[in-house]
Amino acid sequence: MEYCKNFYQIKSNSEIFERIKAERKEVGYYNLPYQDTAEIKDYAQSISKKHIVVLGIGGSSLGARAVYEFLLPSNDYNKDLLFLVISKSGNTIETISIFKYLNSLVEIDSSNCTIISEAGSILTRLANDNNIKAFDLAENVGGRFSVFSVVGLVPLAMVGVDIDNLLNGCK
């Protein structure tokens, strides 16, 4: 393998190309723009709450917030809330702590809560045990790419963003 003075590879290397092709199959974010969004849109349409509270840290909340603030800013707040609890692992201490605290202030149940987490996580089990809507987050999608997964698409669809159009922009 040859490199120029700036460490750019001069010759093509089939091994590197094959690794990139293999990564495309293993890493989930490459396929996010092509996912089926029917369930997310149907669910978003069924929500009658006027406001949504997203509980999450890092990629579990920042991507959706950034897109929302850019596209649909609003300051109209009241108590007609839906708690959207997001944690990839389902046991993120900050998210769980906030969830428990809020549950001590207001009864959180299937009428005002949705959970997004990996299948089989503590949060997903809580959702299943309490008839709370849950979306499974793919294990192979990392936080920084999660805005184009259910982590970002569910809250964005709920506030009226055309998520199919958003995903088309990723293609």
Task: Describe each model-derived feature in a short phrase.
Residues M1-Q45:
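Extended, charge-enriched "interface" segments that sit outside catalytic cores
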Residues Q45-K171:
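Glycine-rich phosphate-binding loops that contact phosphosugars or nucleotide phosphates
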